Amino acid sequence: MCGYERMIDEIDQQIISLLQDDARLSNAVIAEKVGLKSSSVFDRVKKMERKGIIKGYVALVDAELVDKPIVAFIRLSVGSVSEDYLESKRSVEDICAAEPDVLECHAVAGEDCYVLKVRAVNPKELEKLIERIRCNAPVTRSTTSIVLSTVKETAKVFPG
C-alpha cells in the first residue's frame, strides 16, 4: 500500500459509526451489532482513544433552543505574502481560538486565507463579533454569509 498503513479496520469503522450515532451505547450493545465480545469492543475503543482516532465525546446541542440561532460563515484575508504574513496568520488563529463564538476556523487555499463558522444570538452580536475579529487581527478583507437554513450538518466521518 505504498507505505500507508491503515489505522483502523472495517469493524473499527462500524464501532465509530455506532458511537457517532449514540456515544452512550454500551459496549455490549455495540458488540452485538458488530459481532464481537463486549471486552473486544472495549479494547478497540480504548485503542482508538489512545491513538487519538476518537478524540472525545460531546453532546449535540440545538443551538436555536439555547439562544444562538444565527449561523454565519466569515471568509478572511490577511494580505499578501511577506515577512509579516506568518505572524499575521498566527494572530488570526490565536484570536479565533480564543473567541467562543467561533466554532470552526479553517485555513484554506484560494482567494481567502480562512473560513470561519460562527454562531451568534442576533445580527447585532454577529456584527460585534466581526468587529472584534477585524479590530484585533491584521485582516485585509472579510466577507460574511449568513445561513438562511441548514440542509445538512454532520460531524460523522463514517456514515451509519
Regions found by a protein language model. Give the residues of each.
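A compositional/biophysical signature of low hydrophobicity enriched in polar/charged and small residues
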Residues: 1-160
